[in-house]
Swiss-Prot record:
Protein's UniProt name: Small ribosomal subunit protein uS13
GO annotations of cellular component type: cytosol; small ribosomal subunit
Organism ancestry: Eukaryota, Fungi, Dikarya, Ascomycota, Saccharomycotina
Top-rank taxon: Eukaryota
GO molecular function, one term: RNA binding
Biological process according to GO: translation
Amino acid sequence: MPLVVQEQGSFQHILRLLNTNIDGRIKIMYALTKIRGVGRRYANLVCKKADVELTKRAGELTQEELERIVTIMQNPTNYKIPAWFLNRQKDQVDGKDYHVLANNLESKLRDDLERLKKIRSHRGIRHFWGLKVRGQHTKTTSRGR
């Protein structure tokens, strides 16, 4: 079934949101999940808060709708998204709740692992040695490292 578009000039086949290329032919809720740190539930909530139709394709959105989506994703607490919905609650550094996206998520995870290694915790040492971290058995598995 081919995709029918009303105005041929306004459709974008590839969008650039938060340093991520997004396919414009996918519905907006699923297209937002291509951004690292955004799942289906968070994408659904952001679209509802931004008053964007979930049936629209990502390439059909106007620039104003895209800006609304990005501002809600970057500042979720300003739009009454609860703290339990965020992916970084009670941060170790300042104790605040954040929703970390895209490149910031990778750097935060790397910083967390470095902190664990620095304080010589059990998890940090296991990461440093390249072993399983969460209590799995290692007698016969994971010998390739």
